[in-house]
């Protein structure tokens, strides 16, 4: 059996931005337990820069697609080749699908080294983050009875990445260039992947859509309550048309609103969230980022999604979080029934809580 100092934990997780933020405590727990940064198998072009700010995470290997047939996907071949050269060590698979296990087994990873979600369901009321931490406390069969890999029950890792001075400086320079450096900042996140996934964003299947007119009314209310504030519409470049439609719906004071959908790579967004007064968002990764970075958050949530506040407020955190649901108890109800006045009231409550 390898000596304790030679073991490097390997984690497999193919998650969206928010999912990967909520994985950070697991990475920290495993790195502390085994004494080395984790290796990570994942996906997403933003995963590598995010994990560069997590000292508990070492090398990251990315798949372009895990669902594609193996013989048609070079990144899967390369992963399997790498696994075949990989020394034995603990492997934690925070994925429910069979493809992850198939790739591991094809790469020669023996089952005795693997801890996974197979037979390890979430407990009632358990958040994704705490589910991952519980998996991190499991011990691979290959290490049963071994000394040196005990779980530290006093260690309670948070989900916060460690931003550098360069990250903060980049954000401050961007704010100065936009004329935003001296104003309170309220961040708005109207879009997510589901909203922007082709077709008409008002389609009935898009339950995460909150109408442009609602956003415009919200912005008007925010301006009335905090006249000095500058409002920044966040998102990806694909979400710019939605942001432009929202601004076009404003009756006045459009100069106080900045569309930043082309200007916010992951690390700048996280740095911005450490500086902002607050954020209002639909259910999407940047909302996780706000709670993680200590930015007070109002998030609009459909009822079929996870209800645990811990999902949006990774512990420990200094961020007050208000989660708003549709008025209807129908699990398929969309967000449109949440009135702008309700969101404004929740936002004002944040200011009191903060």
Language model features: what each stretch is:
Residues 1-354:
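Catalytic machinery of carbohydrate-active enzymes
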